[in-house]
């Protein structure tokens, strides 16, 4: 599957906000957006007034980059959200949050969504006792997500277990049990508990044209 292979920090600078793509580095003064809070490139410091279309496009790109998704798959998620009964923007974020790689990240077992995606692809994650190696797999209410027993002594998961509770908070719709390397999915998230900083209405406006 195609994926972005460029510099993560340039993506944050391009969007002029932290996308939290580099794990704990994003919370330190070494984060490049703290040092150079302007877009990369020769004209990055220039001041431009974005058009309505560009604002919508940038918001879509920001959201896709946060979750590590390319355009074709992102558009597919939007089309699915648009067919649902609720607000399209809300439903889009619910779909993105229900991805397995996101749940591993949200549960604190990976420092970034990219690291979570790699853990899933390498076969280190189980859902309800069965190995799942597809990052886009959708979790459901009452699912149990856990790190496979053979993988629990790998360095990334030892670090996750030993530093549990020291970083970002686990959202209320999940329960993380670091001692068992397990995440309980109590429910699927409502929009008001999703802390992703995007204006989803701009995405809806872009795709509605």
Swiss-Prot record:
GO BP terms in the entry: ribosomal small subunit biogenesis; translation
Pfam family, one: Ribosomal_S4
S4 RNA-binding domain residues: 98-164
Gene Ontology cellular component list: small ribosomal subunit
Keywords (A to Z) from UniProt: Ribonucleoprotein, Ribosomal protein, RNA-binding, rRNA-binding
Complex formation: Part of the 30S ribosomal subunit. Contacts protein S5. The interaction surface between S4 and S5 is involved in control of translational fidelity.
Function: One of the primary rRNA binding proteins, it binds directly to 16S rRNA where it nucleates assembly of the body of the 30S subunit.
NCBIfam families reported in the protein's UniProt record: PRK05327.1, rpsD_bact
PANTHER family per record: 30S 40S RIBOSOMAL PROTEIN (PTHR11831), SMALL RIBOSOMAL SUBUNIT PROTEIN US4M (PTHR11831:SF4)
Protein name (Swiss-Prot/TrEMBL): Small ribosomal subunit protein uS4
Species in which this protein is naturally found: Frankia alni (strain DSM 45986 / CECT 9034 / ACN14a)
């Amino acid at each position: 599957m195609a994926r972005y292979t460029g510099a993560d920090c340039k993506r944050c600078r391009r969007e002029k906000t932290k996308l939290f793509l580099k794990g704990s580095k994003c919370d330190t003064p070494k984060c490049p957006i703290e040092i150079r809070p302007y877009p990369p490139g020769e004209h990055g410091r220039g001041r431009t007034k974005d058009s309505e279309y560009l604002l919508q496009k940038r918001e879509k790109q920001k959201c896709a980059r946060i979750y590590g998704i390319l355009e074709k798959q992102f558009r597919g998620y939007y089309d699915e959200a648009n067919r649902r009964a609720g607000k399209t923007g809300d439903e889009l974020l619910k779909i993105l949050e229900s991805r397995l790689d996101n749940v591993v990240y949200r549960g604190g077992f990976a420092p970034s969504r990219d690291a979570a995606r790699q853990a899933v692809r390498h076969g280190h994650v189980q859902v309800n006792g069965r190995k799942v190696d597809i990052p886009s797999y959708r979790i459901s209410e009452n699912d149990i997500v856990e790190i496979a027993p053979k993988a629990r002594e790998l360095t990334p998961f030892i670090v996750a277990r030993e530093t549990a509770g020291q970083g970002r908070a686990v959202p209320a719709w999940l329960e993380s049990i670091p001692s068992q390397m397990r995440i309980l999915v109590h429910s699927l998230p409502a929009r008001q508990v999703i802390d992703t900083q995007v204006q989803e209405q701009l995405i809806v406006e872009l795709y509605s044209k």
